[in-house]
Amino acid sequence: MDDVDDDSTHCEASPLLPSNDNDASRWPIRSRWTELSLISRYSLPLVATYLLQYSFSVITTSAAGHLGQDDLAAAAIGVTTMNICGLAFFEGMATALDTLCAQAYGAGNKLGVGLHVQRMLLLMALATIPVGALWLSSPALLSLVLKQENLAVKAGSFLRVSLIGLPGYASFEAGKRFLQSQGDFDTGMLILVVCAPVNALLAWLFAFCLGMGLEGAALGAALANDLRPVLLLLCIAFKRSSHQCWPGLSCRAFRGWGPMVRLSAAGSAVTLAEWAAFEVLTFSTSYLSTMHLGAQTILTTTSVVMWHIPFSFSVGVSTRIGHLIGAGLVSAARRVAVLYSMLFVGIGLMDAIVLFSLRNYIPYVYSADPEIRDLVSRTMLSVACFQVFDAAICGCNGVLRGLARTSFAAWVVFFVNYLGAVPLAMWLELGPAGMGLDGVWTGLGTGLVVIACTEVTYMISIDWRRCVDNVKYREE
């Protein structure tokens, strides 16, 4: 295909770059800028969406920090457990829709988009049962792994209250993919623009005005989570253009779960392996002191806030690659993947510079304890360097999701993290090296370098045309 201008008459699956394999050298600069413009239109609303979504945890942690040191530590443990034993699964499951819905839309099977979403909602409903049982039992379970009994009780109570918002969290993750696969990345953002202030208001009201403490902050976040899918459903009902992808409630939603389950399992494994690495190390800092636990909570929260920027771009990349692969445009997909690799390195460097520049100011957002603030400031350089490699991993995983090759990423992340990075981080933190929190981030960063090199090598070696054939087989 020849060079294509930014023409509104082209659909979202149209290539903006020459798709002929023989035209690789004839890639005009304006096509590169047009592609970057498109991915920015996809991703910038997603950055706002995910940052606003993550603000729910930040607001809860911040409220806990102003309640007291024990409340901050309990919130850290509660959020950690909530992420590992719940949210990571649902977040990972939803990434399967980044693949399935985008490829179905690109292949012209628009009704398949809604069918994939229906299947995912059913799967998430089933997954809520064991997750809910685990959260209800959390006070007793946490007391088995924590030395401080009072922290186990506080964190367990936090999780029980948070369970109220779990169905809303899960269904919103699936529902917003229905619109994103059609190129609508704004609606989810606008919903969170409404819900984030509601969360802050409810957390302040319940925690401080009504004297409910940490449980009040958790309740505010839970109710705001349940509001999100309600507003999303209303938006879809009034957005008639999205109805072209809705087949109506269908018995077919109970069949053909194979691809979705496989991609959901792989997506959950990737997310869980990444998140759990942080959370295991957060637990390990409790063996240093409560102060170190509070500082690590702030550092992890800040790092994850920054991570949402490259992750948001990676979701946009998944959608774009999925559209191109679904439409059979292999050459264009390969070239934009190269372009995106440079983009993610730039994002990582930007994140690192921002964190290091603000290292003496960020701690004041979370804590009034001067010792915690000083420890956070001294460790921020390691966290800043970590961002460069974390952004590169987001880019790799975004391309792999678009190709429906998430399972490879799952294996790589799991083995590298738990056979190398996490043990190294714990040895540097607690072992003879005595690096403390700097050791945590150095160990994890070393693992990211290995993961990035492995995934890039894999993407270069695989047959992208076979990915197209798999889409045709599934969607036809």
Cite the ranges covered by each PLM segment.
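Intrinsic disorder
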Residues: 30, 34, 38, 50, ...
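Small-residue-rich hydrophobic transmembrane alpha-helices
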Residues: 58-61, 72-132, 136, 172-181, ...
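C-terminal structured "cap/appendage" subdomains that terminate the fold
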Residues: 399-400, 407, 411-418, 428-431, ...
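Small-residue hotspots at the loop-to-helix junctions and early N-terminal turns
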Residues: 69-80, 155, 159, 218, ...
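Helix-terminus/linker motif at the lipid-water interface of multi-pass membrane proteins
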Residues: 47, 51-73, 142-149, 205-212, ...
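Hydrophobic alpha-helical transmembrane bundles that constitute the permease/transmembrane domains
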Residues: 47-59, 84, 88-96, 129-136, ...
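Short alpha-helical transmembrane segments in multi-pass integral membrane proteins
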Residues: 2-46, 101-168, 195-202, 207-265, ...
